[in-house]
Amino acid sequence: MSDPEDKPSRLHAGRIDGGSNDDNGLIGAPADFVRGALADRDPLPGTTGFAGFLAEAPIDDGTEPALVRDVLGRQPLFIDRGVEPGGTANDRLPRWSTDPTDLADPKPLPAGAVLTPGATMPWWSLPSPEPAAPSAAQAAVDRALRGVVGDLRASPTDDVAVAFSGGVDSGVVAAALPRAPCYVAGFEGCHDIAAAREAAAAMDRDLRIVEITHDDLRRAIPAVAAATGRRNAMDLNIAIPLFLVAEAAAADGFDRLAVGQGADELFGGYSKVVEPATDHRVEADTVRGARDETVATLPVQLERDVVALRAAGIEPLAPLLDDRLVAAALELPGELLATPAERKVALRCAAAEYVPAGVAAADKKAVQYGTYVSREIDRLARRNGFKRRMDDHVGRYIDSLCRESMMDDHSL
């Protein structure tokens, strides 16, 4: 595999809907570029993710029509379990879409997979390199981040806003987009709004606050559940703040929302990777192994986040999931991922070139807690008779809102 630092990222974005397999239909990268990645089996060819249909995909010794999804699942792609492929040369695959609501019975294509008329095959897998020496590993992250920031600063960004929580991830993304307004969502008094205000002042940035109310939650819960196909409390607690930020940015006329997704997984941002040998939440007993477990969760998480953002009318842009940063992160030794004193060590060091020291060092709460969304959905559930003594009281409340929303839709 050639050096990802030599591959400028293809910062393409957009949404496609499947159905007709007559032409190439790809999101995230040009067809010829993806064909090259298929032919080379290169998992990190220099994109921020791709998915879709290729009329002629180079598979083994020939070419076939195929559906593809990148190795980290950064672009979702769904197939319909209930529709059999057609019989013509250009209609030999199941019905598919980047939006699960287009399909009667959607199932995600696995990350890194290729689906041909004959089979679904794992095609790409993430590299598993040995850890590099600390100085070389840090230099690689520095170079990769410099390339990503440089590409963003050189690209047209008048249609981009930034989801901004005041931490190092969103701080670096905002620094790469110096003219973009920053948006933060949360309930009054929450951690994320306070941190975003402090960071925006330090960076001299325009901050727009989306103050969430209980009415917003009652409206957003069924909307996000319908868009993502998920009703569990954890997924909705995470996706709803993103959805509400995206709605606000879209209402202000922005087409894209830049997010910091992926940094915690790639760079050791979770507490469970610090001392994994004594942490029941991971199976690995090394920092690198625990980090790899969190990276493996990205495809499922990104399906939720990308679909929720698109449901709000905006296209996500996730520069910290650029192949160059992914490749550099995978070579980090454990000491540059997480220690008892600091998490995301290498990323914070690299970010110091772009953000104030306080932003580079800032602690970040998980979005569901930092915005108070998890707390307030629980409060709403209890106010509506779903007490904590009940099994899955929040899930039952979510189901009740979704049923009410469906009944309202049917009555129109």
Model regions and ranges:
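Polar low-complexity intrinsically disordered regions enriched in Ser/Thr and small residues
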Residues: 55, 105, 115, 349-350, ...
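Cysteine-centered catalytic environments shared across enzyme families
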Residues: 1-209, 214-215
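ATP-dependent adenylate-handling active sites, centered on carboxylate activation for C-N bond formation
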Residues: 134-354, 370-372, 376-382, 393-412
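Short linear motifs in intrinsically disordered/low-complexity regions
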Residues: 81, 100, 265, 364, ...
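Short, surface-exposed acidic
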Residues: 355-367
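Charged, low-complexity surface segments at secondary-structure and domain boundaries
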Residues: 18-20, 124-130, 279-285, 313-314, ...
